[in-house]
Design a protein with these regions (language model features):
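Conserved short-loop catalytic and cofactor-binding motifs
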Residues: 4, 24, 136
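Conserved phosphate- and dinucleotide-binding cores of soluble alpha/beta proteins
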Residues: 94-212
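N-terminal active-site beta-alpha-beta segment that forms phosphate/nucleotide-binding
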Residues: 9-90, 95-100
């Protein structure tokens, strides 16, 4: 990464972490992806079952492979043999020990913004798993809550629609059409502004570009 861009991440990143701590998130700043992987492993007890939503960041980090190598019990919907088994695994994930996810956007004052189609990912954030570990690159951090919501709707959602080949307006044009299509992946827009169960939600901010 360009040295100047790296400074643009490393200087404000810890301030956003401090803002998150005031909202009762257990938050950390890692300058590199490698550091973030080690921090995530440190936060996940070996006795936990671990699952995740459809999350590019975790894939990019190679964290799933590390968890498998370390002998964790994984609830992986991608191993399902048919749609019924996939649904069963997704329900099982809602009561796992640790749920891994990223965030579509984050405001500088520490609020997490997530858009979801089926709702399983935001459901896990709100309630169910013993803890949630959110890993997000600094490219997801925006100035205000409104900025973060705009990023989630106008950048993350269209990019994910194209990633999954979904024929919504944003999937076809690259721009949000504020649709209510049957295939809409923006059914739920959730702002997590506080962790009521203190430190249940853990956030690792990474000084690199990760995810969409």
């Amino acid at each position: 990464m360009n040295e100047n861009k790296k400074k643009m991440y490393d200087l404000p990143g810890p301030k956003t972490v401090e803002a998150m701590k005031k909202r009762h998130f257990d938050a950390y700043y890692c300058s590199t992806a490698a550091e973030a992987v080690e921090k995530a492993l440190e936060l996940i007890p070996k006795t936990d079952s671990v699952s995740w939503g459809g999350v590019m960041t975790v894939d990019e980090l190679g964290l799933k492979q590390r968890l498998a190598q370390e002998g964790y019990t994984l609830i992986d919907r991608d191993t399902a043999k048919d749609p019924a088994e996939k649904q069963a695994l997704m329900h099982q994930a809602l009561s796992c020990g640790t749920f891994l996810m990223s965030s579509n956007a984050i405001s500088k004052d520490g609020q997490l913004v997530n858009i979801d189609g089926m709702g399983n990912r935001v459901a896990a954030m709100c309630y169910g798993p013993r803890q949630v570990v959110v890993i997000a690159g600094m490219n997801k951090v925006l100035g205000t809550l409104d900025d973060a919501i705009a990023r989630a709707r106008n950048i993350a959602a269209p990019a994910n629609a194209q990633r999954f080949g979904i024929k919504t307006p944003c999937g076809l044009t690259g721009q949000c059409g504020d649709c209510t299509s049957p295939d809409c992946i923006c059914s739920y827009v959730v702002v997590t502004r506080n962790s009521m169960v203190h430190e249940r939600i853990k956030v690792i901010l990474v000084g690199e570009d990760l995810g969409l």
